[in-house]
Structures are given as C-alpha cells and as structure tokens.
Amino acid sequence: MEIFESFGIEGEVTKQWEPATDEILWCRNESGTLSRMERFRNEPPVGVKWTHGTLQQGRVEEIMKKRITEISGVEVEYSTELSDLTINTRESSNSKASACSVTIRSVADDQEAHRSSETIRARYIIGADGGRSSIRDLMGVAMEGTKGTAIWGVMDILGGSDFPDFGATSVVRSDSDGAVDFVRREEGLTRIYVELNKCAAGWEALERDTITPELILEKCRYIIRPYKLEVDYVEWWSSFTVWQRLSKSMIVHDRVFLVGDAVHTHSPLCGMGMNTGIQDSFNLGWKLAGVVQGQLNYDILQTYETERRPVAEALLDTDRTVLDLFHAPLGPEAEALLAKVPALQVYLGGRGICYHESVLTCRLAQTLGDLTAGECLPDVTVFDYATGRPSSTHSWIKGNGGWAIIVWAGDVSRPSQMNLVQSLSRDMIELRDSLGKSGSMIDFFLIHCSAWPSVELADFPPLFFPTTKTIGRPNGRIFVDEKAVYDGLHISRAEGGVAIVRPDKHIAWAGGLQEVDSLQRYLRQVFRPQPE
C-alpha cells in the first residue's frame, strides 16, 4: 500500500478491496468436534495507516495500468512472446551500451506462419514473466527448491454458509481430514482454499487432472461438517501443488534482472506473491531509472539482489511456516507455530523488511531514535507550520524516483539549535548545487518540536522553501510535531537529527545534525553529478 500511495492509487485500491481485520482458527479435536481455537486481531502496527485487505490481482493490474497510462502515456502490449534473448558480453561493461538483443513475436494470430517478429535492442531487460519465465530459461538460470505432495483446490464463489466465521478470514484444520481457508473478497466473493489429498478415505491417491469444482466443494463440505456450504456461483477455480523454489541468481551479466515469480515460487495461500513481486519491481525500478537517467551511480544496481534475495528467502520460510500451521498436529508444535502468527502478520504486511549494510544503506551511521537505516520510514502525522494542516510523512515521497532528507530540527526556539540547523542547511545547499541536475531529485523537509508562537516561518533557512521568493513565499516543507511524534520515535527534542529516505520509503542514512561529513559521503557515493 505504501508503494501504491507513492503513485496515488491507494484510494482506488481501498475503494474496491475487502478489509481483512480478523483471522480465526478452527480445529477438529480427537473426539471429532470442530471448534474455534484462536482469534487474531489484524491491526496495523504503529506508523502504518492500513490494515490488510484482499483484492483480485486482475483488478490491481487494471488500476496500475490505468495509472501508468495517465502518468506516461505508455500502454501495456499483450499477445507477444519472447523467442530469443542474447547479451553482448563485450559491451556489458559499458553502462550506456544497448548490449541486449531481444526477439519477440506476435501470438495474436493462431497461424504460426503469419506471426510477425521484431528484434529490439535495449540496455536492460526485466524478467517479470512469472514462474515459467522464458527470460530466466534463456539466461540459463536454474530454480532450486522442493515440490510438496499436498494438492489444493482453490475457488472464488458467491454463496453462504452456517459456519459461524464464514464472513471472516478463517482457517479450518483437521489432523485427519485436511484444511480449508476461507478468505473474504471484494463484492461479496469468498476465496476458498481446500486441501484435497490428505488422509480422508479415498482422497490420498487423488491426481490433479481429475479435479473438478464439484470435487473441491465436496471436500470442503466434508472438512467443515456439520456446517453447510451453499454455492450460487463459481467465478473461477483451479488447483495447485506447492513448489517452494528460488532462482540461483536475480541478475545476469549486470543487464538482465528477474523479479517476482520468475525468482521465487511458493503457495498462494497468503497472497504474498503479487505483493512481493511489486516490491521487487519497485526496488529495481527506481534504481534502474536513476542509473539510466544518469542521476545515480551504476554500482547501486547490484543492491537489487543483495536487498531482495534475503526477502525472497524469508518469503519461502514464511510460506513453510504457514503450511506447517495447516499440518502440525494439535499440541505443543501447533502452539509454538501459533505464537509466530503476530510476527507473520507484520511480515505479510511488508513492514518487517530491513535491508542490510550496502552502498545504499548506511547502517554504520549513528541511529536516530527508532529510525534505523534499512527499515521503512514510519508514517507519522505532523502539521504544516504555515497552515496548520495535518500531513503524513509518507505522502511527501512520490513514485517519481525522488529522495527526501528529513531534518528533525528539535527545539529550534533555542538559538544554538537553530544555528545547527542553519549550518546544516548551508552545507546541504552547497552539496545539492554540486550535484547539478541530480541534486533536483532530493527534497528537503524539516520537522521541529517548538511551540507555535516561539519561531517565525521567516526564521528558517531557505533550503526548506520550494521557491526563491523572499516575500509571501509559500511553504510546504516545514512542519511541527504536535502529537508527541518525537517522543513516540524516541528522537531527542534537544538534539534532533537527520534521516535520508530513499524513493521506496526505506531509510538510507540516519544520524545527528552534526554528522555532516558522514551524510555528505553517503550522498556522493550514491548520486552522480550532472551538469545543469
């Protein structure tokens, strides 16, 4: 959702989605009784606006495509397939060379002989073509992992049930019968996942090619007995066997980048695939755009794999834990797994990601309260010092590759503190100007915690005004903390500090107002100076 907010589509997503507020576990005990065991509140952690929600992937794609066209005029072209991909390795060390050659052909015409083909030269290729990725195969990148034995059926239905928690996200599991997962969907739909080939007589030898919608519903009704399930309409159904696999690499010859299911495959039970794929793509996208436009140094592209591979590994670990929740026998093992659910909720929300030390993440710098390099910036509300309007920190960072430097100025009613802010601002103006056009990608914001009457807007440095006018100059970059944000984030009101925030809202560097040398070193190793 934080990524969607960057592109201004979060409102359209939340307008269509079904909020997922509670998660409920039912179990059948040894005596055969089915009963509710646990109920988990799915509340957003501190610094997060949204709880979880469910929305069909096709709808998300339509929202994204519409926004892409609005922003750039670019439209997604379908009915094509990749037939060849080569990399000129002699040119791959030249970052400006179009070292990739791709041949695509139209598949709109069923007649093979009539299919037209086209060869495209490109500097970079992104393989976002799914679990059966042609790009991955053509590059000879292997997938490593295991295939499970459980066969699952999945359906989107309109219907009703006397099962008490049919209206919530619910898991029904039995050591002997298998499991069912009910997930509420948009417009009254319910997604049903049903474990088909576990234990119950006659189901163990089930083959995927024999599965039908009627068979999935039969097994679902068997697992939730004595409760009934009535189905009015089946919108979609399928079946799957879980593969948990990870590609051996995510970057080939520094030119081909794999994202999403082309890198990691797992069960669809928690809806993590699309979310993680979008995060992969956004992580890569702003880096690639910055390099192509000459704003960022070329070596930052390597951080795509160093940052996202650990996330992919954690994704597979999480998937194993979720599957274990369905299969662990009642007792201590199941209780230990249930204790992991709160942490799983944080991870599934995408907020548990912390990137390690790299050219893009300076974790060795002095920390700033709870703001730690590598973690996502908390989304907190502060107030425009000129208008008093509330503003969220995440709303400042748009999906245009822009960076933010947030100066936590502390109590600037103290002259010594304001002097520190003035000195830092002069250094930042000098650095920004030395970067030329690349410096325009950095926006500066200030949050102080002084009382309203104690400081005038004109007392603040010109760095935080988006115009050079000195009379009637508009604001929009200077904010005041009225809701104990400093205290909540454990930032010193007396000392303040600085946080550099990347385009993906992860903190790149955090330290004190006087850590100017470290801050400048970081920016110079990331940004590439460009003449105006």
From Swiss-Prot:
Any GO MF annotation of the entry: FAD binding
Stated role: FAD-dependent monooxygenase; part of the gene cluster that mediates the biosynthesis of hancockiamides, an unusual new family of N-cinnamoylated piperazines. The NRPS hkm10 and the NmrA-like reductase hkm9 are proposed to convert two molecules of L-Phe to the intermediary piperazine called xenocockiamide A. Xenocockiamide A is then converted to hancockiamide D via a series of hydroxylations and O-methylations.
Enzyme nomenclature, EC number: 1.-.-.-
Annotated FAD binding sites: R191, I192, Y193, D261
Lineage of origin: Eukaryota, Fungi, Dikarya, Ascomycota, Pezizomycotina
Keywords of the record: FAD, Flavoprotein, Monooxygenase, Oxidoreductase
SUPFAM superfamilies cross-referenced by the UniProt entry: FAD-linked reductases, C-terminal domain, FAD/NAD(P)-binding domain, Thioredoxin-like
Protein name (record): FAD-dependent monooxygenase hkm7
Applications (biotechnology): Hancockiamide D displays potent cytotoxic activity against murine myeloma NS-1 cells, suggesting a potential antitumour application. More interestingly, hancockiamide C, the likely end metabolite of the hkm pathway, shows potent Arabidopsis thaliana seed anti-germination activity, but is inactive against the monocot Eragrostis tef seed, suggesting that it could be a herbicidal lead targeting monocots. The herbicidal activity of hancockiamide C could be due to its phenylpropanoid-like structural features, which may act on the plant lignan pathways, and hence warrants further investigations.
Pathway: Secondary metabolite biosynthesis
Organism name: Aspergillus hancockii
Signal peptide: none
Pfam families reported for this sequence: FAD_binding_3, Phe_hydrox_dim
Catalytic class of the enzyme: oxidoreductase
Annotated family: Belongs to the PheA/TfdB FAD monooxygenase family.
InterPro entries, alphabetized: FAD-bd, FAD/NAD-bd_sf, Phe_hydrox_C_dim_dom, PHOX_C_sf, RIFMO-like, Thioredoxin-like_sf
